[in-house]
Amino acid sequence: MILLVENYDSFTYNLAQIVGEVTELKVLRNDDKSLYSIADQSDGIIFSPGPGRPDEAGELENMIRRYYDKKPLLGICLGHQAIGEVFGGTVTRAAAIRHGKVSTMITTAPSALFTAPKTNIMRYHSLIVKADQVSKDFIITGQSSDDREVMAMQHKLLPIFGLQFHPESIGTPEGAEMIRKFVTLTQDSN
């Protein structure tokens, strides 16, 4: 079972549809009282997009601190930023606001979630994890070709992934497959 932590964002329902097609799913908001008990039972956790800063999103960062070495984690947009921040990275304003903008992501290192050397991605964000301040425990696996901002990262040893872009959007043609690969990874690790 995958726990999808909902950060008050409508894109969560697109994620839920993709995940729910391949495995059991529970969706709970980031401030739900049963969050930790359901997380304890899950095979992996996905942290959804959402508004605002990661340190203002309910239990988001506390959950990452609690489960980073116990469960596979995938952070999307706000979730990606929260992972970056929890591991000592800096979240800052992007060079430009990217709401509903398609960019090309260049693969900069091998990833368990995608293999194409480049792919179109849909962006909805004004904050980023600063490239030169990503934790040394992480590898940047994808950057936008237009502004070289971090679009994907993964932990060097643990199954922890961050995607700044929206894989659940129709504007990311290979995004659903990325999400399915994460779900498969959670099933393989248990």
What do these predicted regions represent?
Residues 33-42, 133-136:
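Short amphipathic alpha-helix with an adjacent loop that forms part of the alpha/beta core around
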Residues 11, 52-54, 170:
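Active-site beta-alpha loop architecture of Rossmann-like, nucleotide-cofactor-dependent enzymes
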